[in-house]
């Protein structure tokens, strides 16, 4: 049999079996590792037991516990409860002595998914079942070990705006029609896989449901109390960090790893304390605070860090406010953004209808286990930052980055607001074509939503109206929002201004803003108008919100309503006149509600029974239907949504030589996963649109790129399909980089659309590399940003820096991340795209490798690069060809061991 270069024997379409890495010894694949017995003791006042992490820490270093931050305490408990006993002391020492000399395991309690990455993860597991069956294994044995909760929230596009009284029903009907293939597959998964719970479409956003109901904060399982921890297939999973729950956003590949019972191996992260001082000024929302914090924390370079917010300012914030801050952790680059458990936590659990018994357990455990905020007074951090809440003014962020904060008072000085003219009913320069109250970032904060409702009421009383070209919408992350708005009498006020409920889903925040009115779209095209979107979301990257919104601004929900009235971003929102009432000029200050009224309405209108009314039936619909399913999915050959994945066969099962690689693209700083694999609407003239038309889909049912990620033939055509891409290999006659989804095929030097270039290289079996600047792969945690480049034939990416989740996804797909050393960039190397590249050296965690660059002149340049396989586990996954190949190898190895007869003497 032919040998793979890393010592694996090829067998059929799978790499044959490989000896497991030493740190996995004793881990039984696809089974939960049992809890330990040491340091287990009764939890006072309950009939439960808990693991005394403090005693374990003090056994290593007396007095160390009081200085440990919240993050370290939760991870210490996880180790004491779940780590291999033989490894416990060594792993725990990393935390106690704040070392980063070795990896330690983390066993999250849950996996939470939205339907896009959750679906692709389950497509991978269904494909893994096929691969296992092809090799004679039992496909029914492939099941998630860790509980998986999948919430369908990413599929709905706002085709009908909030001014249509039937918008919700119409949008849901369109969602069901477009996604029948996907929902059929998800329904099969619910029955065919064990340990998978599905919340169907139309019920809310995963993070808000997680915050309001799914997270218990403290689990009580088999007589043991322990902290809730989780990974989620979305970068905004830290939303629930507001409750003191360590929740980390991961890609679908890493989530699959956790689903199947594997530890998530890590090194001690940087833990940064952020002391919040002061109190916010009157009229300032949590949105204003988080946008100011995002700017501040980006400047402080907290990428990859775990943040712990504390101090008097933190204590004054409600869980709704804290969740707004925690939600945007990926925007300021942090892995987690935690608030310790305190009275605010208990108040929120009461407000959201948790049981008295659960609330009592949270308080008892937190106080006994050292997770109560008061027990952290002596905690020591690697860095201490301070932020004054009283310094925050009314803010927006834009036009294309969440950390690009601009005070509304400075809009004119920044050149955003300025002179504009309106000719009758035609759209002005800078027209706001989308105004969306959207996203769990803000709609899980009752204060923000109620502020928008009160501003709408005040505007209605003064005769102000939405401009006719503004597509307005309200898409809360939970049905409870509609209940408390109705209770407060504010739902009708929002509807009057065009902000009726269009969905309980992600919608515009995820780029699912839907089609514009055809006449408005045509006017934009004919007049080449500069148009914008204003939304209460968390991201505004170029091209994300809508193809015809050239720029987008993030703002609080009440500001979104105000901009729907103003109608243009050129409007000075603080000073210009919104309208006249009885001859009086009306400005923003005249309709902005007072803090006292917002708080009074929130206190009177948001009630525990609303949450119970919504969630008790939602979580009661998962009883076993009694229908048995085949363990193998019956793939639909004509589907453009769900297709058997190719990761165990063909080119992807072949070797990666890391030799003779040509650059597919040379890219600037801040390349996002939206550049790598966009999620918004598919246009007819795109490669994916042409493919879908060829497959017989009408253009109105193309749906979004995101919804087709279960079919690799459609999804791979999204690779670098963002029209805002700048590939520095493609320049015009004056040497200026051209914008667009373009590539230059070498050695011919022919410029063509990116997909055609990828097809050309695939047909040639040409290995590829990508060269990039700093912060490569920031943004959403979409695994297709890695899958797409791997399917294209990319074997390595050399960049000045990587965002955490995307780097992990690249490794999970068998793509080698390489980081230039400080001072080395694509510019200092004078690359023009005609070069070929080799990677030389032994791949080990953090090793220095050599990038050989061969130029057309015959010259060779040798460049040291850092191997960004950061742990032994990552090396193991990479060498296996990726996490999916590793699953199959290890499953068959375990299956083979179980079938081997034991010799008795």
Regions found by a protein language model. Give the residues of each.
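Fe-S-dependent hydro-lyases/dehydratases of central metabolism
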Residues: 34-905
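Methionine residue identity
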Residues: 1-3
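Short hydrophobic alpha-helical segments enriched in small aliphatic residues
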Residues: 5-7, 12, 16, 24-25
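Cationic, low-complexity basic patches in intrinsically disordered or flexible, solvent-exposed regions
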Residues: 20-22, 898
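Basic polycationic patches enriched in arginine
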Residues: 10, 18, 31-33
């Amino acid at each position: 049999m032919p040998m793979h270069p890393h010592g694996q024997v090829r067998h059929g379409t799978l790499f044959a079996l490989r000896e497991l890495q030493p740190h996995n010894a004793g881990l039984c694949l696809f089974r939960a590792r049992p809890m330990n017995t040491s340091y287990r003791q009764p939890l006072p006042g309950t009939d439960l037991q808990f693991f005394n992490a403090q005693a374990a820490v003090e056994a290593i270093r007396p007095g160390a516990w009081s200085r440990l931050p919240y993050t370290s305490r939760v991870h210490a408990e996880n180790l004491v409860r779940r780590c291999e006993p033989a490894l416990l002391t060594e792993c725990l020492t990393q935390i106690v002595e704040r070392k980063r000399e070795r990896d330690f395991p983390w066993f999250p309690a849950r996996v939470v998914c939205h339907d896009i990455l959750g679906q692709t993860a389950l497509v991978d597991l269904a494909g893994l079942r096929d691969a296992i069956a092809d090799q004679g294994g039992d496909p029914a044995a492939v099941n998630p070990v860790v509980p998986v909760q999948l919430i369908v929230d990413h599929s709905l596009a706002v085709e009908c705006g909030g001014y249509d009284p039937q918008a919700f029903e119409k949008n849901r009907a369109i969602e069901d029609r477009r996604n029948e293939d996907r929902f059929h597959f998800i329904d099969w998964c619910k029955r065919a896989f064990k340990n998978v719970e599905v919340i169907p479409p139309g019920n809310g956003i995963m993070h808000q449901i997680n915050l309001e109901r799914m997270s218990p904060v403290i689990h009580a399982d088999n007589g043991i109390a322990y902290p809730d921890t989780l990974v989620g297939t979305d970068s905004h999973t830290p939303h629930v960090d507001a409750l003191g729950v360590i929740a980390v956003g991961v890609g679908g590949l890493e989530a699959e790893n956790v689903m199947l019972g594997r530890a998530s191996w890590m090194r001690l992260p940087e833990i940064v304390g952020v002391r919040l001082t002061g109190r916010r000024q009157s009229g300032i929302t949590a949105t204003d605070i988080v946008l100011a914090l995002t700017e501040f924390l980006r400047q402080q370079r907290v990428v990859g860090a775990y943040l712990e917010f504390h101090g008097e300012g933190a204590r004054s914030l409600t869980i709704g406010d804290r969740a707004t801050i925690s939600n945007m952790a990926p925007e300021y680059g942090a892995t987690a953004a935690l608030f310790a458990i305190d009275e605010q936590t208990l108040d929120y659990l009461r407000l959201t209808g948790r049981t008295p018994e659960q609330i009592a357990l949270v308080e008892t455990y937190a106080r006994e286990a050292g997770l109560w905020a008061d027990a952290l007074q002596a905690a020591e951090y690697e860095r201490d930052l301070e932020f004054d809440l009283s310094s925050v003014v009314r803010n927006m962020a834009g036009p294309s980055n969440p950390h690009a904060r601009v005070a509304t008072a400075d809009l004119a000085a920044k050149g955003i607001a300025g002179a504009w003219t309106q000719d009758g009913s035609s759209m002005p320069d800078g027209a706001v074509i989308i105004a969306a109250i959207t996203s769990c970032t803000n709609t899980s904060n009752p204060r923000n939503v109620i502020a928008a409702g009160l501003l709408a009421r005040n505007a209605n009383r003064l005769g102000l109206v939405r401009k006719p070209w503004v597509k307005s919408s309200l898409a809360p992350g939970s049905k409870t929002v509609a209940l408390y708005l109705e209770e407060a009498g504010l739902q009708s006020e929002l509807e009057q201004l065009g902000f009726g409920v269009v969905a309980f889903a992600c919608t515009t925040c995820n780029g699912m803003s839907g089609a514009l009115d055809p006449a408005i779209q045509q006017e934009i095209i004919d007049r080449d108008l500069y148009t914008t979107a204003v939304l209460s979301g968390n991201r505004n990257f170029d091209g994300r919100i809508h193809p015809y919104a050239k720029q987008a601004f993030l703002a609080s929900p009440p500001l979104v309503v105000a901009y729907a009235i103003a109608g243009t971003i050129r409007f000075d929102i603080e000073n210009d006149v919104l309208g006249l009432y009885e001859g009086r000029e009306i400005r923003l200050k005249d309709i902005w509600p007072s803090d006292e009224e917002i708080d009074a309405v929130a206190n009177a209108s948001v009630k525990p029974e609303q949450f119970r009314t919504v969630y008790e039936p939602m979580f009661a619909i998962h009883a076993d239907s009694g229908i048995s399913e085949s363990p193998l999915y019956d793939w639909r050959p004509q589907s453009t949504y769900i297709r058997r994945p190719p990761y165990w066969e063909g080119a992807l099962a072949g070797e990666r030589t890391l030799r003779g690689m040509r650059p597919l693209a040379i890219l600037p700083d801040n390349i996002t996963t939206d550049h790598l694999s966009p999620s918004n609407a598919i246009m007819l003239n795109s490669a994916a649109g042409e493919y879908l038309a060829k497959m017989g889909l009408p253009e109105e049912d193309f749906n979004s790129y995101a919804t087709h990620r279960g079919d690799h033939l459609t999804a791979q055509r999204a690779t670098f399909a963002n029209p805002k891409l700048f590939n520095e290999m493609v320049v015009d006659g004056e040497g200026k980089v051209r914008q667009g989804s373009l590539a230059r095929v070498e050695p011919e030097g022919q410029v063509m659309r990116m997909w055609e270039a990828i097809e050309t290289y695939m047909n040639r079996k040409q290995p590829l590399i990508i060269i990039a600047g700093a912060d490569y792969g920031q943004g959403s945690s979409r695994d297709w940003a890695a899958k797409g480049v791997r399917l294209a034939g990319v074997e390595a990416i050399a960049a000045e820096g990587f965002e955490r989740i995307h780097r992990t996804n690249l490794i999970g797909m068998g793509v080698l991340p390489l980081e230039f050393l400080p001072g080395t960039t694509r510019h200092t190397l004078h690359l023009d795209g005609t070069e070929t590249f080799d990677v030389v050296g032994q791949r080990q965690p953090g090793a220095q490798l050599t990038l050989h660059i061969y130029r057309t002149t015959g010259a060779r340049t040798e460049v040291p690069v850092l191997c960004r396989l950061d742990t032994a586990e990552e090396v193991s996954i990479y060498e296996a060809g990726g996490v999916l190949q590793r699953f199959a190898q290890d499953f068959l190895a375990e299956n083979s061991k179980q079938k081997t007869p034991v010799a008795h003497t």
